[in-house]
């Protein structure tokens, strides 16, 4: 386990270390803990949160939504919910889920062979892998096959440097500037208030609520605060995250995945701010088709992989030395490993959210649907007794539309292929993207926004290249110029 994790999780009076199912506690254990029983027990605790109470709540929600869909003439909630999305109908969603499975399965099969070989080093008779083992085995393969240890980059990702780096990158890419307002009111003393400006003129405000505290939401999200209305009010939003808080002795070193999350959520934030100059609140910000909102945020994640971008902020917290280019190259290759399986995992969630809402609620056995779709769409086995749907919050908000994340990942990679990956901080593509994709908000259909920027509807080809990048030649050009 990382030294700073152990420092924050010391044994209590009874000699035991207490670990919660909150994300900052859970994910490092699943990734680094050698004790398989600890990982198994924590995984089962994580996947039974809010059970059985939320099982009944979810069934009630499913029944209400099905009744609404029936009242307005739709066969299912999934069909009703798709009507105002880019997908348009339930049949297109089912087709997309199969399309993703077809793309990811061959890559995932190659990855599973490596993961199983790694597991057999300690368990020679192993023939299968459980879901709770994936993160740990993936980390071991990254070390053995890609010469990369996730902990080797953490010293270069001190929270304060990452925050300033992302602010600087967003300012340069989207032609903005950011100014902190030290005395502005906020809901907690730890929350920072920032103004966004263009050409010296304020265009919006945002709040950074970035560290855990008691009773706080324990995931990461961009939260709209005010809709922007041209000439009446400026848009406001907050980033609510749970990154380790820096202290006098600890600069808040971040995992690679945490930095990616920061980029992702800041992508949502920029989208909200620059699209908040509409005539009507109803089309301001990200008030658009629900299966488009994750595309801009996922695209900004790609800046995290650029050696040029990282050189601007990723410095060792002790020596101040920039992250070595060779380490960045190994990091990117290692980060690409297990994409196939991760996409299949996300696709299984897409299938679960779709399947439970695409039929009559009384016909749905939640645990059975989850186990069936996990086995059908992934190579990992579930643990007996898992009831993860009870704490799968997207079944409430996204309901049948969890496919949105992969739908938008396809769009994001198609968008990113239009940028010069060798120089992401220059050129006019970023401003064309801002004007044609981000700024219109909900004033145009998302399908039109995509066509305006790409010159055509999205396709899956760039996504496939991204998906198989781990097995591509290191010298191959990821993004040939269009």
Regions found by a protein language model. Give the residues of each.
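Active-site-proximal, well-structured secondary-structure segments within enzyme catalytic domains
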Residues: 1-21, 34, 59, 64, ...
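Substrate/cofactor-recognition hotspot
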Residues: 13-15, 23, 36-37, 48-52
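C-terminal, non-catalytic "cap/extension" segments appended to globular domains
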Residues: 16-18, 161, 165-178, 185-188, ...
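Short, histidine-centered active-site or binding-site loop motifs used for metal coordination
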Residues: 23, 46, 243-245
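Short, charge-rich amphipathic alpha-helices with coiled-coil/heptad character
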Residues: 32-46
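Short, charged/polar, low-complexity loop and linker segments
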Residues: 42-45, 146-148, 388-391
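Short, 15-30-residue, compositionally biased linear elements
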Residues: 51-64, 441
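Short pre-active-site segment immediately N-terminal to the catalytic Zn-binding motif
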Residues: 244-263
